[in-house]
Amino acid sequence: MGKTGNDRKSRSTRAAGSDGTLIKKEYLILFAIFLFAIFIRFYSDPSIPYHYDPGKNIVYAHAALDSFPLVPQVNPYFNLGEYYEYQVLFPYTVAFLSKITGLSLVILTSWLAVLTGAALCLTVYFLSRELFGNTTAALVSAFLIAVSRIEILGYVNYYPQIMAMTFIPLAALCLIRYVKTERFGYLLLVAILSALIVLASYLTALVYFLVILIALAVWCLREKKSAISLLLIPLMIVALLTFFWLPIIWRHGIQSFVDIATGDILTPQISAFTNQPWTLASFLSYSSATVIAIGLGICALLLYRKMPWKMEWDFPKVLLTVWLAVSFGLIGSYLFYPILWVDRYFQFFDIALLIVAGFVIAFIIDKLNALKIPAFRYKGYLVLLLLMIPLYGAVHSDTTFVRWGYPSDMEMVEYMQTLPAGSLVVAPPGIQGFWFSALSGVHILGGESAQMIGQHYSGEADSDTIINSPNVNQKMDLIRKYGVNYIVIPYHGNNYAVWNRVLNEEGIDAFNNSLYFAVDKYFSDSSGSTVLLKVKENLTPAYAPEQVDWGITATGYLISIVTLCGFGYFWYSRRKQEKGS
């Protein structure tokens, strides 16, 4: 994995080009790739962000607006109030941008997901250039990331993970520079970026830490280096995130986290780490870029006998090898035990593989250009024509992103914004509840209580019973229990790949009871209708808002702020000392 051609010079050149231009041509190419990545993501998913999880993320953004500028601890919009302890960075960023721009949460959610996802090609470019010192390789990898169908697949749901993945190459770059220079500033950047990855997506962070800690351990053992980095990085992250984890620990206790880790994540057959029906074979068939990368790797073996792995193993090579091995092993784990949610974590392997693919393509280009056969000078660049294959796959994707929302649903959302403040609404569980709450700001009975630590809340199941039970007395018992004021029923056929929950017709017919229910509003469209029922009994929602310990919260923020300032002062002192010497 050495340097090729004149690319060794690229790392030491200044921002200005050799011809006197203000911006080097590779940055112009990179910017064009970034713009194309933005375009292809909107083009591939015209329904963005009306999918499953994004509606939930927008509800969390509403909660973040309520607690701004603090990171929210409570989400009042689901389950009569719940703790807010899951993937906070993306919705908080949406709320922050809404505060300073005044734009809607839906628009900001769409653009933040696309921009952070497209920015992955930028962070991959800089990591690749750090790894190989080869501008061509870095640009090819950036392009492959821009058109990778595996990366585009994330837009169906996983916006927080998209953000976390974009931080990972930057964190890896800073870690490489820290190992090379042992400068505290790079270590601090690793800690800050790692903390952001944790806040963005816990599960992404878990795999990320697995990769970097194994790589550091292998490097320390191989070079007989001090293992202090293995301890420093986690300790610095824990200190920086005190504002976030301390209130959670105070509420639930350490044992709850142990139970969650062993009982809900690692061991059960159905969990956040349970494999979907995606296998390594399906990954290969889905990603043409992967097939090209593997094929070109074989070609590189034939072109060059003295392979890069026979060279001196430095930390960048160790890190990239561990990244490939761990992510590939997790994909292949489906053959032995379902430990990974593959449709999310294919991205780890995809990123590492496409970084290597960029280098292999640049290597083959150099070797072909060096061949003394009759042809034009830059014959090696014909290899770049292979990039048309993943480009075609991205532009002509056969993946359908199922969306939410018929015209009558949208009209109902607008009407529901006029409901009395604090009204409690029942909607069909899952995506319907997410989006009616996200767009109208109403409080919904239900949500995803499975993500709450220490809660045994049945609002989601009870919402389903209220809507679908044919027994009106059973409906009313639950309605009185929670103090429900309204019931929204989207009643459509499954047309045009629009998400719609199947409803029990007998359960819907049971609402034709004028003693308990009245139609408050009704909208229809060519596919069906959306009706809002008012509960005739004047009930008060049985809110039991979760309590925030402001003393513990203030302590957590104080520790995090003092820690960050202390790290900053230590870095400044070290830098000043280095300049003085």
Label each PLM-derived region with a short phrase.
Residues 161, 338-368:
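Hydrophobic/aromatic-rich transmembrane helices and adjacent perimembrane loops
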Residues 21-24, 182, 222-232, 296-328, ...:
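Membrane-interface helix-loop-helix junctions at transmembrane boundaries of multi-pass membrane enzymes
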Residues 39, 146-150, 194-199, 238-244, ...:
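Aromatic-anchored segments of alpha-helical transmembrane domains
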Residues 53, 159, 196-307, 339-340, ...:
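Transmembrane catalytic cores of multi-pass membrane glycosyltransferases
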Residues 5-8, 63, 119-122, 131, ...:
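Extracytoplasmic
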Residues 215-216, 297-306, 359-363, 561-576:
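Alpha-helical transmembrane segments
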Residues 23, 27, 31-169, 401-405, ...:
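Active-site lumenal/periplasmic loops and adjacent helix-entry segments of GT-C-fold
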Residues 169-186:
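Membrane-interface transmembrane helices that cradle and orient dolichyl/undecaprenyl
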